[in-house]
UniProtKB/Swiss-Prot annotation:
The gene is ROW2. The lineage of its organism: Eukaryota, Fungi, Dikarya, Basidiomycota, Ustilaginomycotina. GO terms for biological process: appressorium formation. Plays a role in the formation of the appressorium, a specialized infection structure with the purpose of penetrating the host surface, and is required for proper remodeling of the appressorium wall and vesicle secretion. Disruption phenotype: Results in a thickened cell wall with altered chitin composition and leads to secretory defects. Decreases virulence on maize; double knockout of ROW1 exacerbates the effect. Keywords: Nucleus, Secreted, Signal, Virulence. Its main location: secreted. This is Appressorium protein ROW2. It comes from the Eukaryota. GO terms for cellular component: extracellular region; nucleus. The keyword Nucleus applies.
Length: 290
């Protein structure tokens, strides 16, 4: 079996993948050649938070501290599909140089940490972050039709595993006017199986089976479940009839429940003193939250 470091080296050599980004030392743009419209040096450029920020970094740390992609503005007609290449980051907590998800937007949030990915799912009123009422939504991922990703230059990080920042290279975020799900996968030999990008019309419940209940705010550990779209060793491809049912959700454990979530400063933000993916002894995320 490959170790993590050996696998990353092999992939980098074969596919030309660049080294992981450190969120404390981001360039202005990570994909300027691909036509990136936003920025990645967000704290330096925008400060703690800015309602006009065009930040394209996402942080998924806990049920209280996560971000989602949303349109930078609305014209009353554009859909998620129209704007997927230029989406910007909206976060529950300040300190990342992003826009804020307004209090009251999120109606339910269910955070799951597994050995292979972190995931946040739920419902809300995303007209508050410029998604049109009635928009059934679309998928954001790091590849897109051109290979530059949607949004172009989008980067995802977490500190849920070690307490220090770790880039999650494979991810998927489905956003509609009323529902969201975001799964971000750790680097490894099966990251594209846990975070596939070929089921863009199947939506949240099929791609990320989980709890979506309104009025519930929970944080759990858990198991991954099954690879989306793979049944008895065979891969189903979107559009082939019949359409199979979603895989069952993995098992949850160690759940903590909260009455609500709200804006406020993040407990920890990227700093030039931080070290990427250094394993340290740490208390659970919910014990750190105020």
């Amino acid at each position: 079996m490959f170790t993590k470091s050996v696998f990353i080296a092999l992939v980098a050599g074969v596919l030309g993948v660049t080294a992981a980004y450190d969120p404390a030392h981001m360039p202005a743009k990570t994909d300027a050649k691909g036509g990136q419209t936003g920025y990645n040096d967000c704290q330096q450029r925008y400060g703690a938070t800015n309602p006009k920020a065009k930040c394209q970094n996402i942080f998924i740390n806990s049920v209280k501290d996560f971000c989602l992609w949303g349109p930078p503005k609305t014209n009353g007609a554009d859909t998620v599909g129209d704007l997927e290449a230029v989406m910007v980051s909206y976060c529950m907590k300040s300190g990342y140089g992003t826009r804020l998800i307004p209090d009251g937007t999120i109606h339910g949030a269910h955070f799951l940490k597994t050995p292979s990915f972190v995931q946040i799912t739920g419902t809300g009123d995303f007209t508050k972050i410029h998604i049109q009422a009635g928009d059934e939504g679309g998928e954001l991922d790091p590849h897109g039709a051109t290979g530059s990703g949607n949004p172009v230059g989008g980067q995802v990080f977490t500190r849920a595993y070690t307490g220090n920042w770790e880039q999650l290279p494979e991810w998927q975020n489905f956003m509609s006017a009323t529902e969201y799900c975001f799964r971000a996968c750790r680097s490894g030999p099966w990251d594209r199986q846990w975070c596939p990008h070929i089921y863009d019309v199947m939506g949240c419940l099929w791609n990320e089976p989980a709890n979506y209940d309104r009025g519930v705010f929970e944080q759990c550990d858990g198991t991954e479940g099954e690879w989306p779209g793979v049944y008895s060793g065979s891969t189903w491809y979107q559009g082939v009839k019949p359409t199979p049912a979603a895989q069952p959700a993995g098992k949850s454990s160690n759940c903590r429940y909260y009455p609500s979530i709200s804006n406020g400063p993040a407990i920890k933000t990227p700093s030039k003193r931080s070290v990427m993916a250094t394993h340290v002894k740490r208390s659970p995320e919910w014990e750190e939250e105020p």
